[in-house]
């Protein structure tokens, strides 16, 4: 069951696979055995990676801020399943999961967290500022909401070049109240730019609940005055995300302009590693874990349908843990950047 009732993206079926209605009323994609196994492995990699990052932070290997993506894995994994080569992704500071889903190496991401030479930004960007032109990932941004206008710019570049690539701009429910978000909506609607605005509504902007910070709590309707269609999606179900992603991508590629997807999701950890999250109860968190966990949903489907045994799933978990352990070892042993690198890669 979804965290709160989600709406169907449209009555039209997804282009890739037939869709059906789940009990919450939202559209879900039909997943094959291979689809579920792929989603399970990729979400599990993000989960185990973030758990290890939290451990390294506690041990003092990671400095500064560290925002974990635990609980929200279905959002980025489901969206990536609908993309093609050349589509771009940009997000805010809770970005480790997005990078892994885009295919960036666990070693490179973890080494960047510890500020090492082998990090994706050569140890100079840290948790919030990683980029990969090769993977079409444009950050990782520490300024709240700044990525929305940049993601709109990526879509403008696609339109200008005449390709059919789509830009995905992720931001949270807190960033949704930033003025530059609405400037971006206006420009994207005016020029019919191929951008999907993905609001990851995890219910809390740092420690402030949505109801205390937003007069309009249905973020999918934030673009209505610009004529931008928007839909709520069960962001805890990777199939629902995939179905919404398929239709949103088709909407953009066909020249219809921007679209907004509000992902109803939940983060299990605090806003950052320094946040004890006392603004919510343990029962609330446990209820979400026990009833809506995105990984457990896929695991249950795999076993219920006979697509995987418990031993096979344990083997996948072991393989993922080995990848994460290797990344952690590398991130602790790789040298820090030489002092001569201090002023390189700096835009003046």
Curated annotation (Swiss-Prot):
GO molecular function: pyruvate dehydrogenase (acetyl-transferring) activity
Keywords of the record: Oxidoreductase, Pyruvate, Thiamine pyrophosphate
Cofactor(s) of this protein: thiamine diphosphate
Entry-linked CDD domains: TPP_E1_PDC_ADC_BCADC
An example Gene Ontology biological process: pyruvate decarboxylation to acetyl-CoA
Disordered: annotated span: 1-21
GO CC terms in record: intracellular membrane-bounded organelle
Cited SUPFAM superfamilies: Thiamin diphosphate-binding fold (THDP-binding)
EC number: 1.2.4.1
Keyword Protein biosynthesis tagged: no
InterPro entries given in the database record: DH_E1, PDH_E1_Alpha_Subunit, Pyrv_DH_E1_asu_subgrp-y, THDP-binding
Function: The pyruvate dehydrogenase complex catalyzes the overall conversion of pyruvate to acetyl-CoA and CO(2). It contains multiple copies of three enzymatic components: pyruvate dehydrogenase (E1), dihydrolipoamide acetyltransferase (E2) and lipoamide dehydrogenase (E3).
Protein's name according to its UniProt entry: Pyruvate dehydrogenase E1 component subunit alpha
Origin species: Rhizobium meliloti (strain 1021) (Ensifer meliloti)
Gene that this polypeptide is encoded by: pdhA
């Amino acid at each position: 069951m979804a965290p709160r009732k989600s709406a169907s993206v449209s009555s039209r079926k997804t282009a890739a696979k037939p869709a059906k209605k789940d009990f919450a009323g939202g559209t879900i994609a039909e997943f094959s055995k291979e689809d579920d196994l792929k989603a399970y492995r990729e979400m599990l990699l993000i989960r185990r990676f973030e758990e290890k990052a939290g451990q390294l932070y506690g041990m003092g290997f990671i400095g500064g801020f560290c925002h974990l993506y635990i609980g929200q894995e279905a959002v980025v994994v489901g969206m990536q399943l609908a993309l093609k080569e050349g589509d771009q992704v940009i997000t805010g500071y809770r970005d480790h999961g997005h990078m892994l889903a885009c295919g960036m190496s666990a070693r490179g991401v973890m080494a960047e967290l510890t500020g090492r030479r082998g990090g994706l930004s050569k140890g100079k960007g840290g948790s919030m500022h990683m980029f990969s032109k090769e993977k079409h990932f444009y950050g990782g941004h520490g300024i709240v909401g700044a990525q929305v206008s940049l993601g709109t710019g990526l879509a403008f570049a696609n339109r200008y070049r005449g390709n059919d690539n789509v830009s995905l701009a992720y931001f949270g429910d807190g960033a949704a109240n930033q003025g530059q978000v609405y400037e971006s909506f206006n420009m994207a609607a005016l020029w019919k730019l191929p951008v999907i605005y993905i609001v990851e509504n995890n219910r809390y902007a740092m420690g402030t609940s949505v109801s205390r910070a937003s007069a309009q709590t249905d973020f999918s309707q934030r673009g209505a005055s610009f004529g931008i269609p928007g839909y709520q999606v069960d962001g805890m179900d990777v199939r629902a995300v995939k179905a919404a992603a398929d239709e949103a991508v088709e909407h953009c590629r066909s020249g219809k302009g921007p679209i907004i997807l509000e992902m109803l999701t939940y983060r299990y950890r605090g806003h950052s590693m320094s946040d004890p999250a006392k603004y919510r109860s343990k029962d609330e968190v446990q209820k979400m874990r026990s009833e809506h966990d995105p990984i457990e949903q896929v695991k249950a489907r795999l076993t219920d349908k006979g697509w995987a045994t418990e031993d096979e799933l344990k083997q996948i978990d072991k393989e993922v843990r080995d990848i994460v352990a290797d990344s952690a070892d590398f991130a602790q042993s790789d040298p820090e950047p030489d002092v001569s690198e201090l002023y390189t890669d700096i835009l003046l």
